[in-house]
UniProtKB/Swiss-Prot annotation:
Native source species: Bacillus cereus (strain AH187)
Gene that this polypeptide is encoded by: cca
Listed cofactors: Mg(2+)
CDD domains linked: NT_ClassII-CCAase
Record: residues binding Mg(2+): D39, D41
Protein name, per record: CCA-adding enzyme
Binding residues annotated for CTP, in chain numbering: G26, R29, R110, D153, R156, R159, R162
E.C. code: 2.7.7.72
InterPro entries registered for this protein in UniProt: Bact_CCA-adding_enz_type3_sf, CCA-adding_enz_C, CCA-adding_enz_firmicutes, NT_sf, PolA_pol_head_dom, PolyA_RNA-bd
Purpose of the protein: Catalyzes the addition and repair of the essential 3'-terminal CCA sequence in tRNAs without using a nucleic acid template. Adds these three nucleotides in the order of C, C, and A to the tRNA nucleotide-73, using CTP and ATP as substrates and producing inorganic pyrophosphate. tRNA 3'-terminal CCA addition is required both for tRNA processing and repair. Also involved in tRNA surveillance by mediating tandem CCA addition to generate a CCACCA at the 3' terminus of unstable tRNAs. While stable tRNAs receive only 3'-terminal CCA, unstable tRNAs are marked with CCACCA and rapidly degraded.
A Pfam family recorded for this sequence: PolyA_pol
UniProt GO BP: RNA repair; tRNA 3'-terminal CCA addition
Superkingdom assignment: Bacteria
PANTHER family given in the database record: CCA TRNA NUCLEOTIDYLTRANSFERASE 1, MITOCHONDRIAL (PTHR46173:SF1)
Record text on subunit structure and interactions: Homodimer.
C-alpha cells in the first residue's frame, strides 16, 4: 500500500473539494493479486477543468478523454473524470465520451471485471462487478455481456489472451466463446496495437498457456501471416519460454517455431521498427551459423556480445537445454577477446598511409580488416609498433 499512500493526498484533496475519487484499474488488480504495482491511476467525479484548478502542477494530456496528469510528491499520476462512452467506431474508438458523476457508470465501460475494481484511499474495495471473485477463481471475465465488450473494442480479445500470459488466469467460458465468435473483428484493428499486445503475450510468464488459448479460440487465424499456423503454434507450446531476457529473443524463437522463412517480411507486416527487425533477423542468422559451428573468437567478435548472448539463449531453447552454461561460456570467451570492437584497435588509416608511403585507396580499408582479424585471432598484439612489425614480416607494407 506504500505507493498508494503517496498518491492518497490527491484523493483526499479532491474529496475536500466535494468530489468523489478512487484508485482504479490495473494497480488495484495487482495489489489484490500481490503483483508488482505499475502506474497508479485515479478516477474522479471532478471535471478536467476542476482537476486542473485544484492542482496547479498538472499536464493536460488527454482532456477529450477526461485525463489530466497531476504531479504530487514528485510523481505523475493520471487523474481521469468518470465517463461513459457512446457507440464505438471501427470496433476500437468511441465516437464520443460523456463525463458523468457516477463511479458505477465509469466502471461499467471497462474491459474485464478484474480491471473494474475501485479502491478508496483507506484501502476499501468498491467491487460492483465481482472482480475479486474472478481474481480468486483466476478467471478473465468481461464486464457485462462479452459480445458487447468485444464489438465495442475488438482489441480487448487480444488483451484477454495477453492477460492469460501475464497473470496465468484462464478465460471464463462465455468470454472465451465470444472471442471465438467475434475474433474476425480483430482484422479492423491497427496491427501496431495488436503487436504491442502480442509482444506482452510472448514475454509473459504463462506464454505457453496463452498460445494454447490463441489456438483454441482461433484468434490466431485473424493475425497477419499466422492464418495457416495452427499446428506450428501448438508445437510452440511444447517448449519452455521462460529463459528469455529480451523481447527480441522471444520474437526470434516464435519465428523459429512457426517456421517463418522470410522473417523480415513478417516483421515489417507487423510494423516493427527497422532497428528491431535488424536485431531479430541478426539473432536468427546467428543461430543458423551456430547450428553449423561452435563459437570461436572471429565468429563471436563479428557477431558482437549483444546478439551472441540473445542467439545463444534462443538456441538453448531450441535444443531444450536451459542451464545457461553456453551463455556463460560465450560471455567468458568475449571477455577474453583482445579487442571488443574496431574502435579499440591501436592503429588508424593515417598510420598505414605514413608507413606505406602510398596513395589513399581501397587498400587502406582492406588492410585495416586484415589487421583487425589478426588481432582477434591472437596473431599480433594490439600495439602500434607490434602491428607495424607484423605487417613488414608479412610483406604487407
Amino acid at each position: 500500500m506504500e505507493r498508494f499512500k503517496k498518491a492518497s493526498s490527491i484523493i483526499e484533496t479532491l474529496k475536500q473539494q466535494g468530489h468523489e475519487a478512487y484508485f482504479v484499474g490495473g494497480s488495484v488488480r495487482d495489489l489484490i493479486i500481490d503483483r508488482p504495482i505499475g502506474d497508479i491511476d485515479i478516477a474522479t467525479s471532478a471535471l478536467p477543468e476542476e482537476v486542473m484548478a485544484i492542482f496547479p502542477r498538472h499536464v493536460p494530456v488527454g482532456l477529450e478523454h477526461g485525463t489530466v496528469i497531476v504531479v504530487e510528491n514528485g510523481e505523475p499520476y493520471e487523474v481521469t473524470t468518470f465517463r461513459t462512452e457512446s457507440e464505438y467506431e471501427d470496433f476500437r474508438r468511441p465516437s464520443s465520451v460523456q463525463f458523468v458523476r457516477s463511479l458505477e457508470e465509469d466502471l461499467k465501460r471497462r474491459d474485464f471485471t478484474m480491471n473494474a475494481i475501485a479502491m478508496t484511499e483507506e484501502g476499501k474495495m468498491v467491487d460492483l462487478f465481482a472482480g475479486q471473485e474472478a481474481i480468486q477463481k483466476r478467471e478473465i471475465v468481461t464486464v457485462g455481456n462479452a459480445a458487447d465488450r468485444f464489438q465495442e473494442d475488438a482489441l480487448r480479445m487480444m488483451r484477454g489472451i495477453r492477460f492469460v500470459s501475464t497473470l496465468g488466469f484462464s478465460l471464463e467460458t462465455k468470454t472465451k466463446q465470444a472471442i471465438e465468435t467475434y475474433g474476425h473483428l480483430l482484422e479492423h484493428i491497427a496491427i501496431e496495437r495488436i503487436t504491442v499486445e502480442f509482444e506482452k503475450l510472448l514475454t509473459g510468464t504463462y506464454c505457453v498457456k496463452a498460445l494454447k488459448e490463441l489456438v483454441e479460440t482461433k484468434l490466431f487465424s485473424h493475425l497477419p501471416y499466422l492464418q495457416m499456423s495452427e499446428e506450428k503454434l501448438l508445437k510452440a507450446t511444447q517448449y519452455k519460454w521462460d529463459s528469455f531476457e529480451a523481447d527480441i529473443e522471444a520474437w526470434a524463437f516464435f519465428l523459429y517455431c512457426i517456421g517463418e522463412e522470410h522473417p523480415a517480411v513478417f516483421l515489417r507486416q507487423w510494423k516493427f521498427s527497422n532497428k528491431k527487425i535488424k536485431d531479430i533477423v541478426a539473432v536468427l542468422l546467428t543461430i543458423r551459423k551456430r547450428k553449423e559451428k561452435d563459437w570461436d573468437t572471429v565468429f563471436l567478435y563479428k557477431t558482437g556480445i549483444h546478439i551472441a548472448e540473445m542467439a545463444e539463449r534462443v538456441y538453448e531453447a531450441m535444443i531444450e537445454s536451459y542451464d545457461h552454461t553456453a551463455v556463460n561460456r560465450v560471455q567468458t570467451l568475449f571477455q577474453a577477446l583482445p579487442i571488443k570492437n574496431r574502435q579499440e584497435m591501436n592503429v588508424t588509416g593515417n598510420d598505414l598511409l605514413n608507413w606505406a608511403s602510398k596513395k589513399p585507396g581501397p587498400w587502406v580499408a582492406e588492410m585495416i580488416q586484415k589487421i583487425e582479424e589478426a588481432i582477434v585471432q591472437g596473431n599480433v598484439v594490439n600495439e602500434k609498433e607490434c602491428i607495424r612489425e607484423w605487417l613488414q614480416e608479412c610483406n604487407l607494407l
